Curated annotation (Swiss-Prot):
GO terms for biological process: thiamine biosynthetic process; thiamine diphosphate biosynthetic process. This is Sulfur carrier protein ThiS. Keywords: Nucleotide-binding, Phosphoprotein, Thiamine biosynthesis, Thioester bond. It comes from Thermus thermophilus (strain ATCC BAA-163 / DSM 7039 / HB27). Gene3D superfamilies: 3.10.20.30. GO terms for molecular function: nucleotide binding. NCBIfam families: thiS. The lineage of its organism: Bacteria, Thermotogati, Deinococcota, Deinococci, Thermales. The keyword Membrane does not apply. Is the sulfur donor in the synthesis of the thiazole phosphate moiety of thiamine phosphate. The modification Glycyl adenylate is found at residue 64. C-terminal thiocarboxylation occurs in 2 steps, it is first acyl-adenylated (-COAMP) by TtuC, then thiocarboxylated (-COSH) by the cysteine desulfurases IscS or SufS. Belongs to the sulfur carrier protein ThiS family. Pathway: Cofactor biosynthesis; thiamine diphosphate biosynthesis. CDD domains: Ubl_ThiS (cd00565).
Length: 64
């Protein structure tokens, strides 16, 4: 199982980019944590997810 935003999901073998695209995530506006390593959305590694991976997707917001 892969943990995606705190929920276990059977996503092994899919790439992180595939999963984000299937979720309809706009890569420009997010940060992604993959096993506690942070990436801006456009820099997300295109590697297959493995059992035990932990992914958190966080929307970036501007304030003023």
């Amino acid at each position: 199982m892969v943990w995606l935003n705190g929920e276990p999901r059977p996503l092994e073998g899919k790439t992180l980019k595939e999963v984000l695209e299937e979720m309809g995530v706009e890569l420009k506006g997010v940060a992604v944590l993959l096993n506690e390593e942070a990436f801006l959305g456009l820099e997300v590694p295109d590697r297959p997810l493995r059992d035990g991976d932990v992914v958190e997707v966080v929307a970036l917001m501007q304030g003023g």
